Every structure is written in structure tokens, then in C-alpha cells.
Amino acid sequence: MTVLTKKDHGWYQGLYEVVNKEKYVGLKKPFYRSSWECRFMSWCDNNPNVIKWSFESIEIPYVITENGFSKSHRYIPDFYVEILNKQNQLKKFLVEIKPYNQGPIKNSKNEVYVPKPPKNKNAKALKIYYLEMKTLKKNTLKWNAARSYCQRNGL
């Protein structure tokens, strides 16, 4: 049984103990960094429709360009999952577990979430805003690379 361990910094992390070992195809032991990841691992492990799953098993290259300089990076999605749907068809997915404010999430009006500039323009508020925008840009580039990867690989 996996036990959520709360760290001093306020989030849960630990090794997930796989119950259905024949379904887990990852090369390394699954390590959750949040309660959301732990719950998703448990869902994959115990859901009879999940045929295979792995944790951080795929690397996708992408490039970030800042100030005219390009730097190569690699994006490692949290999960790879193969599921049998209701029509008994095999569906393959890459899954990333992220909070709402860290990704290009669309609301019900199909608008992409963008952090609002701070009302108070002090140094701390501006720094937080800058970091949120930088994270959103980086995650958008990663996920665009992931979409291309999925299209090329039939996911």
C-alpha cells in the first residue's frame, strides 16, 4: 500500500508501490511528486481498462528561444497510458499532471488562461508575474512538442 508522505515544503511525494506489476512497463519505480500524481498512479494501477502504464518513460526534445538564443531541452511527460475504451479499441495517451495556472488551459469560452498582471507593481509582485509567464511559455512549448510527438506516433 502506498502512503502519502507530506514534506516540510507542503506537498506530498514518495515511491508508489505498484500492485498490478504486469501493467506497469516503466524502467524506473514510479515516484509521485504530488497527491494528484499518486492518485493517478493508483487509478492506472487499479483500473481494469488500463492495459499498460509507465511513469516518466518518454523524452520529447523541444527548443526555447530567448533573447535571440536557442537552447535545446527535453520534456518528459509524467505518464504514458494504454487504455481499452468502451468499443474495445486500444487508445494511447501521454498525461501531464499540472495545476491550472501552469498550463495553456482553455476555459468554457475556449479562452487560454494567462496570468493577470499584478495590480501592485512592487518588485515581489512583478517577479511572481514574470515567473508565471515564463512557466506558461515553457509549458506551452513543451506541450506543443508533445502534440507533435503524439501525431507522429499515433497517440
Task: Please report, for each region that a protein language model flagged, where it lies by residue.
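Electrostatic, structured charged patches in enzyme active sites and in nucleic-acid/phosphate-binding
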Residues: 1-155
